[in-house]
């Protein structure tokens, strides 16, 4: 019996599922928002939220745990230097899933996964770029 087993298999082997979630975590950290199917989005939320909680406290041990799960130095750096401090005061609920209709080919329910807060990006005004071109 499979009582108390809440894992979605997503029609994949365990190694494929692990690699897919790892890639989705890296993409979400890099782009801050991704488009995927609703079941994948719900599974992604289950694995990315503990990673952000881990990043709130920047220690060598936590960085090693994050690298063990992400396997990407750039993602770990952004996680601890940008996202961790951004969500320091928030006690959970770092991601949002927005349902966005159905995919054209197979009618699969699609969703948009994004962080609740986005990091501030320094905007370049048009005047400064025009001055730089001169």
UniProtKB/Swiss-Prot annotation:
Q: Name one GO biological process term.
A: translation
Which GO molecular-function terms appear in the entry? structural constituent of ribosome
Q: Which UniProt keywords apply?
A: Ribonucleoprotein, Ribosomal protein
Q: Mind telling me which InterPro entries this protein's record contains?
A: Ribosomal_bL17, Ribosomal_bL17_CS, Ribosomal_bL17_sf
Question: Subunit structure, per the record?
Answer: Part of the 50S ribosomal subunit. Contacts protein L32.
Question: What HAMAP family does this protein map onto?
Answer: Ribosomal_bL17
Record family assignment: Belongs to the bacterial ribosomal protein bL17 family.
The protein's name in its UniProt record: Large ribosomal subunit protein bL17
